[in-house]
Amino acid sequence: MKLVIFSKKFQELPLPEFGDLVADMGFEGVDLTVRPTGYITPEEVVEKLPEAVDILKARGLEVPMITTAITSAEEPYAEETFKTASECGVKYIKLGYWKYKGFGHLRSQIDEIRRALKDIQALSKKYNVTAGMHTHSGMNMSAEPAILWEILKDFNPDLVGAYIDPGHMAVEGGLGGWLMGMDILAEKIRMVAVKDYGWFKKDGKWIARTVPLGEGLVPWRKVFEILKRIEFKGPVSLHSEYKGMSLEEIIEQTRKDIKYVREILKSI
């Protein structure tokens, strides 16, 4: 497993400064945002992704994965993104999200997504990369692991696999759902996101909010024991998506989070 950091919360920093920070925090690489409002926009990918990879490599960092908003092989810059990523040595590409349209649409949407993924799989094969669907809680078609398995069951996971996020999985199934989700998706898992959630009451309603690792719903030791058991070798992307924190506070918390993860990895 390679520990990388998701760049989303650090985009106010120039990339060289961000790279210095990431190296100092002890990460092995970066999960770089290549999407609208990302470090790199889709329009810039051909020119700027190679530059970004070189900047980070100069600081001893890999870029094993990028985060995109791609949901169709036909959309503008989709093929350019896959091609450029491959040329830069980026192996893993996070896809965008398909929103659930509401009751009565589930089965037709599963079929619709499968059709889109067939073309995305062709891009993955052409450029020797792995695309991943992220288990994001809420009104996303990939929120529930069992539904994601139904979507992915006929695809080669080395071309189109699962990008699991135990934090989001625990939001959807905090007792046994996350565990059954890892179980059903085990052979499909190619990327892992790390963040934790807790439930809080706000204005009379329960909301899920990001909390420091080890303080939320996810039993991280068990998660990493399972990943070791299934011989997971892909990137582990740490998501410092804390709300209400300054950048300095996010950096401080991220240092604590990576220490927490490394201590677990050393002990299992």
Task: Give short role names for the model-derived ranges.
Residues 1-95, 99, 115-118, 125, ...:
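N-terminal pre-domain/capping segments
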Residues 221-223, 231, 235-236:
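H/E-rich (His + Asp/Glu) clusters that bind or coordinate divalent metals
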Residues 19, 122-217, 224:
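Acidic/histidine-rich catalytic cores of soluble enzymes
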Residues 91-106, 127-138, 237:
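Active-site groove signature of glycoside hydrolases
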Residues 44-50, 77-81, 107-117, 144-149, ...:
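Charged helix-capping and loop-helix junction motifs
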Residues 61, 90-91, 129, 230-234:
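A short helix->loop->beta-strand "cap" motif at the edges of active sites that frequently abuts
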Residues 10, 237-248, 252:
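A short, acidic, flexible beta-alpha connecting loop/helix-capping segment that sits on the rim
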Residues 38-41, 70-74, 100-102, 137-141, ...:
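Short, small-residue-enriched loops and turns at beta-alpha junctions
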